[in-house]
């Protein structure tokens, strides 16, 4: 029995040193050297001040801004510490109520509801933190945002196109629009206008 204790203790110490110290240290140094922005949270700065992250959505509800996906996090929207979906099933009345409330908010903000509403504007993502919407969801909001900002719909649509990211490597994922980046571009365009 005593002959087993020493190898077990040595193995425990070596594995802790490798997996608890060496590997995290090497990955941290590698991340900072090769991908510094991503390793630090993909933070977005404006005028030297951090205004958000490209990875975590933010609540926008003013008519002059594009709106992102709903957040299912509690106790506040887009709470990274509370990441997770609502887990509401398709037949759950609460999900139907949330969808109806979001459609009403879109209508109250002046969005034309004569066209079908893109699903990502009325449902939460699996994480509850999704910072991106589909180009269709952005296009759906162009008229409302243009009217609220006294810009032409074409000018706003051009900003949407400029802020649309295609598929990764041309095949992975779907085209998407980062809502925070688009709204910051809108603010900059209106300031220059």
From Swiss-Prot:
Disulfide bonds: none
Residues spanning the membrane: 7-27
Membrane topology classification: Single-pass membrane protein
UniProt keyword annotation of Nucleus present: no
A Pfam family per the record: KdpC
Keyword field contains Mitochondrion: no
InterPro entries (UniProt xref): KdpC
Keywords noted in UniProt: ATP-binding, Cell inner membrane, Cell membrane, Ion transport, Membrane, Nucleotide-binding, Potassium, Potassium transport, Transmembrane, Transmembrane helix, Transport
Recorded GO MF terms: ATP binding; P-type potassium transmembrane transporter activity
Localization: Cell inner membrane
Domain of life: Bacteria
GO cellular component, one term: plasma membrane
Role according to the record: Part of the high-affinity ATP-driven potassium transport (or Kdp) system, which catalyzes the hydrolysis of ATP coupled with the electrogenic transport of potassium into the cytoplasm. This subunit acts as a catalytic chaperone that increases the ATP-binding affinity of the ATP-hydrolyzing subunit KdpB by the formation of a transient KdpB/KdpC/ATP ternary complex.
NCBIfam families linked to this entry: kdpC, PRK00315.1
Subunit structure: The system is composed of three essential subunits: KdpA, KdpB and KdpC.
Similarity remark: Belongs to the KdpC family.
Name assigned to this protein: Potassium-transporting ATPase KdpC subunit
UniProt gene name: kdpC
């Amino acid at each position: 029995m005593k002959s087993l204790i020493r190898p077990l203790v040595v193995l425990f110490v070596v594995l802790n040193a490798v997996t608890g110290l060496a590997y995290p240290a090497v990955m941290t140094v590698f991340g900072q050297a090769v991908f510094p922005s991503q390793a630090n949270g993909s933070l977005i700065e404006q005028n030297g001040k951090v205004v958000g992250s490209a990875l975590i959505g933010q609540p926008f509800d003013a008519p002059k801004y594009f709106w992102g996906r709903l957040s299912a996090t509690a106790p506040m929207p887009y709470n990274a510490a509370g990441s997770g979906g609502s887990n509401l099933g398709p037949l759950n009345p609460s999900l139907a109520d949330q969808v109806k409330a979001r459609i009403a908010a879109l209508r109250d903000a002046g969005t034309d509801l004569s066209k079908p509403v893109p699903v990502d504007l009325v449902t939460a993502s699996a994480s509850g933190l999704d910072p991106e919407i589909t180009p269709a969801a952005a296009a759906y909001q162009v008229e409302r945002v243009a009217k609220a900002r006294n810009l032409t719909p074409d000018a706003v649509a051009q900003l949407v196109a400029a802020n649309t990211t295609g598929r990764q490597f041309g095949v992975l994922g779907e085209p998407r629009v980062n809502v925070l980046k688009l709204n910051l571009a809108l603010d900059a365009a209106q300031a220059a206008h």
